[in-house]
Curated annotation (Swiss-Prot):
Lineage: Bacteria, Bacillati, Bacillota, Bacilli, Lactobacillales
Location(s) in or outside the cell: Cytoplasm
GO BP, sorted A to Z: peptide biosynthetic process
Record GO terms (molecular function): translation elongation factor activity
Xref: Gene3D superfamilies: 2.30.30.30, Nucleic acid-binding proteins
Protein's name in the database: Elongation factor P
One GO term describing the cellular component: cytoplasm
Stated family: Belongs to the elongation factor P family.
Pathway(s) of this molecule: Protein biosynthesis; polypeptide chain elongation
Entry-linked HAMAP family: EF_P
Keywords, ordered alphabetically: Cytoplasm, Elongation factor, Protein biosynthesis
Length: 186
């Protein structure tokens, strides 16, 4: 059991037979009354999200999540296929379960797959990935004053705001947690 005050973003717990992932968590002290935990929670199995509050001393059962290193092979018919790097066993994961993560995946990329018992519940991406710019607006000379950047579509379909000097076919390092441009890849 774990206290609600100890829950952090990314942790998973069990509640009423559901597997719940904490997306955001913060302490909130209203003008009157006791401190509460404000949280954005996601049901791992259904994908539905809810905003809720809990007392800091409320207890929840922490879920035991195992991870295995796998290699992303390909996607086909609403399934993403991964191969275990140790046993070469293949796992089929519904693309609806990993919809956001798919925007960062290239074939043969190594990631970690998350298990709850025998059930696949998600992926852990590396903190950064290197993706090629598939399409972006051409650079305009002298347009460096604004600094607002421009949208660029990456080879996986991910759209990232990039600086004006970035052009198509360049390799960029992307932060997977926030989906933001970090730098040009070497």
């Amino acid at each position: 059991m774990i206290a609600a005050s100890d829950l952090k973003a990314g942790m998973t717990f069990e509640q009423d037979g559901k597997l719940i992932k904490v997306m955001e968590a913060s302490h909130h002290k209203p003008g009157k009354g006791n401190t509460v935990m404000r949280m954005k929670l996601k049901d791992v199995r259904t994908g539905s999200t809810t905003d809720t509050t809990m007392r800091p001393d409320e207890k929840v059962k922490k879920a035991h999540i195992d991870t295995k290193p796998v290699q992303y092979l390909y996607s086909q018919d609403d399934m993403a296929i991964f191969m275990d790097l140790e046993t070469y066993e293949q796992y089929e994961v519904p693309t609806a379960l990993i919809e956001e993560e798919l925007k960062y995946l290239l074939e043969n990329m190594e990631v970690k797959i998350q298990f709850y018992g025998e059930e696949v519940i998600g992926l852990t991406l590396p903190t950064t990935v290197i993706l090629r710019v598939a399409e972006t607006q051409p650079s305009i000379k002298g347009a460096t004053v604004t600094g607002s950047g421009k949208p660029a579509t990456m080879e996986t379909g991910l759209v990232v705001n990039v600086p004006d000097f970035v052009e198509a076919d360049e390799l960029l390092e992307i932060n997977t947690a926030e989906g933001t441009y970090l730098k040009r890849a070497k």
